[in-house]
Amino acid sequence: MYAPRTTPWPLVALFTAGYLAPYLLPTTVGRLERGLDLSATQAGAVGSLLLLSSATAGFLLASRVERTGARTLARLGLVLAAVGYGGAALTTTVPAVVAGAVIGGFGSGTATTVAATRIAAEKDPHRASALGLLSVSALAGAVYLTVPHLPGHGLTLAAIALTALAVWPLTSRLPGGTSGPLAAEAAGADGTGASRLPHRRSGMVLAGAMLLWSLAQNALWGVSGRIGVDQAHLSEPTVGVVFAVALGAGLLGVLGAGALGSRLGRALPIGGGTVVIAGCIALSASATGLGSFAAGEIAWNTVYPVVLSYLIGLAASLDARGRWAVLVGSASSLGTAAGPLTGSVLSAQAGFPVMGAVLAVGLLLVAVPMTGVALHTGGRPLLPGAVRRRGGHPAALVAATTGTPSGAVPEVGAPEQPVVEIPLDGTPEPARTAYDTAAATRAPGGR
């Protein structure tokens, strides 16, 4: 009998704690702007510093999880997140808020890195990452429905800190280290040993493209709240409801990506999906009422996790140990970090519609190298109906990463290997009585 499939709930919870800060970025930036009397650019800069700190943790710790131990790093990250975000929520002094956001961001990045690395080593990474995405989207949606009805600049920061504290007890079920058989298995799975990264050129191109791709996404996400309030003339509670519905649509996107699997390969979802996202960004940035604003945000948040999941799947297919998944995810986090400030500056200088047009054109240009990598890089193959996935940092989105745990499977479309008949010499014994049993027999001459 097969062993029952277990759910790695500690990794799901850690994934949720790490990804919650980027999901709450629009309301965090908006609350800082109104609650601390900051300009839009200043509030966007605080959000960028938070995400930059998170990305830095990913770059620094991507190769250290195995040596240091998942439990130790996860607890460190959760402590930093609780202390940093909690301190920023309890003070109104701007330098202290900035310092707390930076410390908390590093904690979020640490938790995300541990979760991504461990999920990549799971027998069924798709299931764990999909549950993590569903969890963080549901939690963020609940916050978006609650926060607009309460005053204060630090509510979203406090929500992230409390989530980190709630996840802490589950870290006792994480391993103290990933050395030994797991490390040897991961090293052997990609055939590269313990140090050399495979597919370096494709990985670097994908990392650079992901940085710009994420920058464009989060340039809009960081100012979406202001677009809804200032340009579409909606109330903050209404904008919160739109965001909650959009995140709910994102849940459908995650489930759709899992159901779609490998049927369309990777190139079409990545290239075609990015084109659709570009149109959604242009629509949302030029919205002047509830209909256009909601349509742009909901459509965008539906397609975004689908494309992101295939991008992370492409990164994970380049290295079975999950190193490219973490490094590409960290590059994505750098773009995410620069997004709020970029969106604030562009919108302040040229207005929201022009900002949306610039971001849309940039996405169309970035789609070309990403699609090229998907077309020309083999990595681990996509197999029809495959449910085993390889995931990594960001985001988001490890959920529809597709691959197999071994490189010994032929690519889809590869010619079948011929079956060769091997002739055997001799003829079988005609009678079964020619054979004796394996039981003990009398010795020669015995009675």
Feature names for model-found ranges:
Residues 72-86, 268-283, 357-360:
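Structural signature of the two symmetry-related core transmembrane helices
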Residues 94, 100-135:
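Cytoplasmic helix-loop-helix junction between adjacent transmembrane helices
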Residues 109-123, 303-320:
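Intracellular juxtamembrane helix-capping segments at the cytosolic ends
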Residues 261-311:
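C-terminal transmembrane helical hairpin of 12-TM major facilitator-type secondary transporters
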Residues 15, 19, 318-360:
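A late C-terminal transmembrane helix in Major Facilitator Superfamily
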Residues 56-72, 120, 252-266, 347:
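Helix-to-loop junctions at the C-terminal end of transmembrane segments
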Residues 56-94:
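Conserved MFS/SLC helix-loop-helix module at the cytosolic interface between two early adjacent transmembrane helices
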Residues 122-126, 130-179:
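Helix-loop-helix hairpin linking two adjacent transmembrane segments in secondary transporters
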